């Protein structure tokens, strides 16, 4: 079993990776597959592809943003294997923290089945040692869609993830907004998140 970078993957591996990605996310949450190839797309291969992750370094921070993470099957351990391989690989190349956003199960108007899915997703990440960050009103630009998200993070040094608070938390919020979503610290959206999270 190994992680294969998109640049090194055979066409049939990329075709299967595309299928896993498109099956794993609804259309409103998907970027084009070609867009993913601008970042670091990796595929976990065990005879055939079983999971896909897309990552983007958060310039100059030592952190990496996990854009997408999806296993071909759920409930069979593929997600845990993918997580272990990705976090190990990111640590080996020098990243000290992985940050990502997840859909908020408390978002208004969400169907009960979707609430359950979102809670399970967060539960999976918590079991892997990640932390939900105490950030409120994190609203990354997603085209026409305005969707509040939650931020999570995991330290990649091998030990438990320490609480992320104060100036460290502010730096995470600003880095994600700037290097993932293109919003600088003075943007009203960023300022609002920092203010309501007690980080201004």
Where is each model-derived feature located?
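A conserved beta-strand-loop-helix scaffold within acyl/acetyltransferase catalytic domains
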Residues: 14, 22-73
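C-terminal "cap" of GNAT-fold acetyltransferases
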Residues: 117, 131, 138-188, 195
């Amino acid at each position: 079993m190994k992680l294969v970078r998109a640049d090194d993957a055979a066409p049939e591996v990329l075709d299967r990776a595309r299928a896993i990605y498109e099956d794993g996310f609804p259309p409103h949450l998907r970027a084009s597959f070609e867009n993913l190839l601008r970042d670091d797309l990796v595929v976990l291969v065990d005879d055939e592809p079983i999971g896909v992750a897309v990552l983007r370094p958060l310039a100059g921070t030592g952190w990496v943003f996990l854009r997408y993470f999806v296993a071909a099957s759920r409930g069979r351990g593929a997600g845990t294997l993918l997580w272990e391989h990705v976090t190990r690989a990111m640590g080996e190349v020098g990243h000290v923290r992985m940050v990502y956003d997840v859909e908020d199960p408390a978002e208004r108007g969400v169907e009960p089945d979707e609430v359950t899915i979102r809670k399970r997703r967060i539960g999976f990440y918590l079991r892997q040692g990640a932390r939900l960050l105490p950030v409120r009103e994190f609203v990354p630009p997603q085209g026409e869609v305005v969707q509040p998200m939650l931020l999570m993070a995991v330290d990649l040094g091998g030990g438990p993830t320490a609480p992320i608070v104060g100036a460290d938390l502010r730096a995470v919020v600003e880095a994600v907004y700037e290097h993932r979503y293109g919003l600088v610290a003075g943007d009203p959206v960023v300022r609002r998140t920092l203010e309501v999270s007690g980080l201004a």
